[in-house]
């Protein structure tokens, strides 16, 4: 019960009057003034208690009992009386239990007063310069206070808390409590009220009378928990075991030795490779645990500056043991994180983002590296060793070699650098192919020279280097294998073809493809074991090769995704990369200058007229019909040159088109169009808009490069993502190999090369191709058509059909036709070019005619090599000055040809020192390897002259070996006889050439004085004629000698 102190006028008589009350105090609450109330005083004996009615504010009156008569007497004598209801006082005031409605009204009044006080408090606290309810004050990273708005989520939570607080009832300390005493052995008042309130539910069930056993919960105080933690830490430290504290934030602890003392180490974020502003998340409970942990971490010895270094990350120490400058710590312990500007930082405090990147962490990275190295090395090393391992190599050298091997396999600046990993994935930068090969060679040499005992490391690097050098650049053999194996469907030739396609890929081939290559090789081995040959024959009389009237279906041109709304083909990125074709192998037509200069398409041994002039269309129908007539060429019948055979059967796709009667189909006039690519050789042609390189520009292929239209047609079927690589391969690799006017065989080989890397081009349609058997040229018709008519039509329609020309067993003259031609071959014939005797005669004619020899060498730079047949021709070639004249020309024109001529000059000097023809021939034979090497450096098209020179040099090389054996055995008589016959014949040819020169000189020597004397006698006397003639002859003789000397000096 609360103590009540009040002052009132109390009388001992029965009176009813209004009196003014004083102050009333409840317990320790401040006194409260009382309003005027009616006090009823009853006269009672001194021993009887007195009743008082007290009213507080608007509350119901409360009846208060007073003490006995002695107390009343005292109160009458004192104006103010203090009554305490405790039992220790003389009198007790007992407040009777009010009704329940009164209690509710008391609660309502209290809530109203509390709300009023809260409003007053809020109004008094509100300042015009303060913050709003939806704002808060935060501290920035630089230590500056800043007002920021609260989030909508935070405001929602705040309003929810206020609602819950308002709904809670207010329990006053003076609220009456129900008595727990029973009256007459019955239930107490509190039990009766609780029984009235409780609802028996459900009504239809009988409650169980079984008493439930409730076990007492085992509880431990905070002090007991701390004692338990200390005991566990002490045990784990002794055993060096790991601890994991599970709270709001888990903490993992282990024990390590530093400075001969065992410390506790916490796993912080940067030990896991993470850089965060707060390295360790810890609350109050975690900090308390860390404080306990610090008592058992170390031995309390002072840690001087410089002791804490790499490897101390996460170690827990006491604050007072550190003497170095340090940051603040949220508790008594200090968790070491790192150092920044000579200041240690605790892992639990939050630092700025910039500092988190600059701080030097004290993690032992090397230890972590070797920890992972040892773990994986021991886990994955092989167990099938037949010996017992022991330490026989120097550990330091092992580490150095391991570092070199790591750099060879994984070139990097740091093994933990993610950018170096990206370079290795993309094979770029320091991990590019050439860079790795160069670096690999350097490191291998270092291991060989500095670590001779590590031979196995050198072997591993050798194998690795071999795997990197996996680019297959043997294009010539690839083409020859393709020509031999493609199209032969019998025996092992299909397997040879597929094996060739896999080998050309090199390192880009997958393991599955290599497995397939082994299977193909097995089939080839079986074929070689059981070899069979079948001969089939075909008759030209029964040859029919009709062209299909149905157009070839090209899926690329039918795909809606590659067509615009008008149905035209969309080049996309292919059009952009097609610039590599148009800028290098096409020239721009200027319509302002007219089309006349482009009407005649000149080839080395002929010409063909284009229909480009027909782009100007007249409006007169008669003139227009007259314009649609072509200019026929001389017709050519169906011969063996028109067909291609494979094992006796006709390969119709590689033949000329015929009618049903067997006559050749002659080409008609092909009308021109602008800005189009025309493809399709069967049925109606297809017109594809050229890519928009430059607006309203017309392009025509340069002379010798009309076959570029084939690659441009293949580009239609190439994926956009591969267009760049496709055009680069064509420009840099294939066109440099093909050159001008290549053969159809070379063009077909180039198409197969592209098919290997870009399979989608196999069904690409080709432009129209016309065959001119007279000039042995195949014309690739572009969008400007052909005014010349009467050519044969080649049936080849797709790239796959064109590749059939590469088959080695294909008997065809067409594959040797030029897509154009060469001047040397067309002027002199392939048979003469392939004959060494004809070539050396041609060289002999040019020995004393340097201008003619220079023109011949422009077409055939290998012509001087035929002088190797005769030592006399080499000496004449050297003594005449023609060799020196050609050297001076080719030093600036072609250095590779100049090198060949220098080798010939040195050979001529060696030959001149020997008198015997046989000895001279032996000198020539010993110089053959040098000449062959010099010839290999000369770049030129694979024409008839080049192939003839290759065969000639191969013949000399193969003759030199048995001749050397015969000479050592003494069998030289027959050879001497044949050489002498050849030398006499060639010497006669050289002599006739020299006689011509002498005859011209003699004529000049005789005619000059006669003409001069005649001119002199016309003006002067006859007596002086003979004397003047002698003087003129002498002057002419002197001049001729001076000119010869000057010419020799200039040649030198």
UniProtKB/Swiss-Prot annotation:
| A Pfam family | Potyvirid-P3
Name the site position(s) for Cleavage: 362-363, 820-821
Q: Which residues, if any, are the signal sequence? A: none
Q: Which GO terms describe its cellular component?
A: host cell plasmodesma
Provide the active-site residues from the annotation: 270, 279, 313, 706, 779
- State the span of motif (Involved in interaction with stylet and aphid transmission): 414-417
- Span of the annotated motif Involved in virions binding and aphid transmission: 672-674
Tell me the GO molecular function terms. cysteine-type endopeptidase activity; serine-type peptidase activity
Sorted keywords for this record are:
Host cell junction, Host-virus interaction, Hydrolase, Inhibition of host innate immune response by virus, Protease, Serine protease, Suppressor of RNA silencing, Transport, Viral immunoevasion, Viral movement protein
Q: Which residues form the Peptidase C6 domain?
A: 698-820
State if Transport is listed as a keyword.
Answer: yes
- EC id: 3.4.21.-, 3.4.22.45
Gene Ontology BP, a term: symbiont-mediated suppression of host innate immune response
**What post-translational changes are documented for it?**
Potyviral RNA is expressed as two polyproteins which undergo post-translational proteolytic processing. Genome polyprotein is processed by NIa-pro, P1 and HC-pro proteinases resulting in the production of at least ten individual proteins. P3N-PIPO is cleaved by P1 and HC-pro proteinases resulting in the production of three individual proteins. The P1 proteinase and the HC-pro cleave only their respective C-termini autocatalytically.
Write down the InterPro entries for this protein, in alphabetical order: HC-pro (IPR001456), HC_PRO_CPD_dom (IPR031159), HC_PRO_CPD_sf (IPR042308), Pept_S30_P1_potyvir (IPR002540), Potyvirid-P3 (IPR039560)
Domain Peptidase S30 intervals: 219-362
Q: Which family does it belong to?
A: Belongs to the potyviridae P3N-PIPO polyprotein family.
The record comments on the domains as follows: The N-terminus of helper component proteinase is involved in interaction with stylets. The central part is involved in interaction with virions and the C-terminus is involved in cell-to cell movement of the virus.
Q: What is this protein called?
A: P3N-PIPO polyprotein
